[in-house]
A protein has these predicted regions:
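Bacterial N-terminal signal peptides
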Residues: 16-29
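N-terminal "domain-start" segment that seeds a small globular fold
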Residues: 33-63
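Thiol-/selenol-based redox modules, centered on thioredoxin-like
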Residues: 154-197
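Short, internal strand/loop/helix patches
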Residues: 121-160
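N-terminal secretory signal peptides that target proteins for export/translocation
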Residues: 1-12
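Short active-site neighborhood of thiol/selenol oxidoreductases, capturing the structured segment around
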Residues: 65-86, 90
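Structural microenvironment flanking redox-active thiols in thiol-disulfide oxidoreductases
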Residues: 86-136
Length: 197
C-alpha cells in the first residue's frame, strides 16, 4: 500500500518521490478492462473440458494438443461467415512463430462443421489445429454462449470470442478478450503479455 505522507528522519515524502512510487506500484490489473470474459473460469482455475474433433476428423484432447508449455486456445464465432474471425485467424497465422517460440501450440474452436474447417485450412493455409465444437458442448461448459441469438438462428451457438493460455495441466494462465465481438485482442500485445511460469 502506498503511503502519501511518511514521517521519517528524512521528512515528508516529496511530490516527485510520490509520483515515482505511484508509477512503480501500478500493476497490469490497474489497466484491466471491466469486461470479464468466461467469468466462471478465472485465471488460476482449471478448464472444464477440451475434447473435440479437428479439421481432419481426429479426436483431440488437451494432452494431444499441448506444446511444451501448453496451448493458446481461441474461441471463435465462425470461420465460415464471420469476417472478424477470419481476420483474426489470418493474423494468428502470421503471428504463430511468436507463440511457438514460447512452447505453445495454437488451437481454435468454433461450431463450424469439420468439412468447413478443412476448407478453411486449405483456403487460408492455416497450419494449426481447428476444432469442431459439436453440440456447442465447450461453449456451454465454459459458459461463454452469446445469448443474442435464439435456437434456430444460424448464429445460435457462437461464443463470446476470447483467448486462453492454458498450461499442460489445464490451468488457465491468462485470458484475453474484448466485450465487443467486432474487436479482437492484438496478437503482438497477447504475445508480449504472456509470461511462461
Amino acid at each position: 500500500m502506498l503511503t502519501l505522507f511518511s514521517q521519517s528522519r528524512r521528512g515528508p515524502i516529496t511530490l516527485r518521490m510520490f509520483l515515482i512510487a505511484a508509477i512503480i506500484s501500478i500493476t497490469p490489473e490497474t489497466f484491466a478492462q471491466d469486461f470479464d470474459w468466461a467469468p466462471d473460469y478465472p485465471v488460476g482455475s482449471t478448464i472444464p473440458l477440451l475434447e473435440a474433433q479437428d479439421q481432419n476428423g481426429e479426436l483431440q484432447t488437451l494432452k494431444t494438443l499441448s506444446g511444451e508449455n501448453g496451448i493458446l486456445l481461441m474461441f471463435n464465432r465462425s470461420f465460415d461467415w464471420c469476417p472478424y474471425c477470419k481476420a483474426q485467424l489470418e493474423g494468428l497465422e502470421e503471428a504463430k512463430h511468436a507463440f511457438s517460440t514460447l512452447g505453445l501450440n495454437i488451437v481454435t474452436i468454433t461450431y463450424d462443421p469439420i468439412e468447413t474447417l478443412k476448407l478453411v485450412e486449405e483456403d487460408m493455409k492455416v497450419s494449426f489445429t481447428l476444432l469442431h465444437d459439436k453440440n456447442i458442448k465447450h461453449v456451454n461448459a465454459y459458459n461463454i454462449l452469446n445469448t443474442d441469438y435464439e435456437p434456430g438462428h444460424f448464429a445460435y451457438g457462437v461464443p463470446q470470442p476470447g483467448i486462453m493460455f492454458v498450461n499442460p495441466d489445464g490451468k488457465i494462465i491468462a485470458k484475453f478478450a474484448e466485450e465487443n465481438f467486432r474487436q479482437r485482442p492484438d496478437w503482438s500485445d497477447v504475445a508480449e503479455a504472456l509470461i511462461i511460469p
